């Protein structure tokens, strides 16, 4: 179980970082 939990946590972090980068690029393009 710990392996699945850690994998899910890593996936969530990766998704958050990707979303942050995408939003940052969108804001830079808007400006």
From Swiss-Prot:
One of its GO terms (cellular component) is chloroplast thylakoid membrane. It is a single-pass membrane protein. It is found in: Plastid, Chloroplast thylakoid membrane. One of its GO terms (molecular function) is electron transporter, transferring electrons within cytochrome b6/f complex of photosystem II activity. The chain crosses the membrane at residues 4-24. GO terms for biological process: photosynthesis. Keywords: Chloroplast, Electron transport, Membrane, Photosynthesis, Plastid, Thylakoid, Transmembrane, Transmembrane helix, Transport. Its main location: plastid. The 4 large subunits of the cytochrome b6-f complex are cytochrome b6, subunit IV (17 kDa polypeptide, PetD), cytochrome f and the Rieske protein, while the 4 small subunits are PetG, PetL, PetM and PetN. The complex functions as a dimer. PANTHER family: CYTOCHROME B6-F COMPLEX SUBUNIT 6. Belongs to the PetL family. This is Cytochrome b6-f complex subunit 6. The lineage of its organism: Eukaryota, Viridiplantae, Streptophyta, Embryophyta, Tracheophyta.
